[in-house]
């Protein structure tokens, strides 16, 4: 594992005395302060990269949390004001008012935080409202370039909730929405659908337009959807392969953002992020690096050492001979070798 996901209720101290008392007893003035301390401790003690989903945030909160978390997120769910009316799913949830969530997306862009967001389908919204929600995300992303992932999440009815008997969206609605998201955001945006919410139809979901399964943990349940267990990674790999794609790991911060580290990652996290990525911004598969005499090189490197390339261009051969002789290589020569 390379990520520690923090997902929590939004500022419970504003509503519940028990939350205020618990925070005060631990010495924190707010849940945001507590979250900062917890994420900082996890990062320093384990080296895992925190990804935070704490709800709506003010600009100063985002700026502070960004120093302990390379990425954050909040689901927009929908821009439909209609869903906030009495008798509708978002009634009585002021944190889900569309303007409030859109402002958090805007704040994240201003703060330069790589951000995950998305929509929830099957809660009474229309197809038009889904498109409007995706376009609202796109508008903010075009201003700031910070949205690294769009989640298309299908509603699942849960026990002990007011919507326990609400109908769930069918596969056709999910596939339609994924396809529309891909059209609206183009080929470069990462689009995700949670695999544990659609078992048995994963190849169809891939074909609809996703390129990411989101976080799939081998050690914890999905705490947001505990009734829906994660697929085993081996099974997910087979399902992905059956759709003609290759399953590979990524960090919580996407490759393009990790590579542009000066813009998107807080300086306190630079060293760790760089340690974890290869030249393409993907997670490294081993701890070895050139010049490390204490760690066994990976199989690919050992194979190249044991069975070296027999035909080298003259300039590469000359650079290698210089290196063997102890000559300090120029930057251009090092680039040529790679």
Residue ranges, per PLM feature:
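Conserved Radical SAM active-site core
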Residues: 1-145, 311, 334-336
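Auxiliary Fe-S-binding modules of radical SAM enzymes
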Residues: 44-46, 131-338
């Amino acid at each position: 594992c390379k990520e520690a996901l923090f997902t929590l209720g939004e500022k419970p101290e504003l509503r519940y005395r028990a939350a205020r008392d618990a925070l005060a007893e631990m010495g924190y003035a707010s849940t945001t302060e507590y979250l900062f301390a917890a994420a900082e401790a996890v990062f320093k003690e384990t080296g895992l990269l925190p990804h935070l989903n704490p709800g709506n945030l003010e600009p100063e909160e985002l700026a502070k949390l960004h120093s302990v978390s390379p990425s954050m997120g909040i689901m927009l769910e929908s821009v439909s004001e209609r869903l906030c009316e009495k008798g509708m799913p978002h009634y009585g949830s002021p944190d889900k008012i569309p303007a409030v969530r859109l402002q958090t997306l805007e704040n994240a862009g201003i703060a330069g935080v790589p951000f995950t967001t998305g929509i929830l389908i099957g809660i009474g919204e229309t197809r038009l409202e889904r498109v409007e929600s995706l376009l609202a995300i796109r508008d903010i992303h075009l201003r700031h370039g910070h949205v690294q992932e769009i989640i298309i999440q299908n509603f699942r009815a849960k026990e002990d909730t007011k919507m326990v008997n609400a109908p769930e969206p069918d596969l056709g609605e999910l596939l339609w929405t994924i396809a529309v998201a891909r059209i609206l955001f183009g080929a470069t945006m990462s689009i995700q659908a949670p695999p544990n919410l659609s078992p048995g139809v994963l190849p169809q979901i891939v074909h609809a337009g996703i390129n990411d399964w989101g976080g799939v943990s081998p050690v914890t349940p999905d705490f947001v959807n505990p009734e829906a267990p994660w697929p085993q990674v081996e099974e997910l790999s087979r399902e992905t392969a059956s759709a003609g794609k290759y399953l590979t790991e990524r960090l919580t911060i996407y490759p393009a953002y990790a590579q542009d580290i000066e813009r998107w990652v807080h300086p306190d996290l630079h060293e760790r992020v760089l340690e974890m990525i290869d030249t393409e911004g993907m997670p490294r598969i081993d701890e070895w690096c050139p010049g490390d005499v204490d760690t066994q090189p990976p199989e690919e490197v050992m194979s190249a050492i044991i069975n070296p390339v027999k035909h080298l261009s003259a300039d590469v051969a000359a650079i290698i001979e210089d290196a063997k002789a102890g000559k300090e290589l120029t930057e251009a020569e090092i680039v040529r070798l790679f």
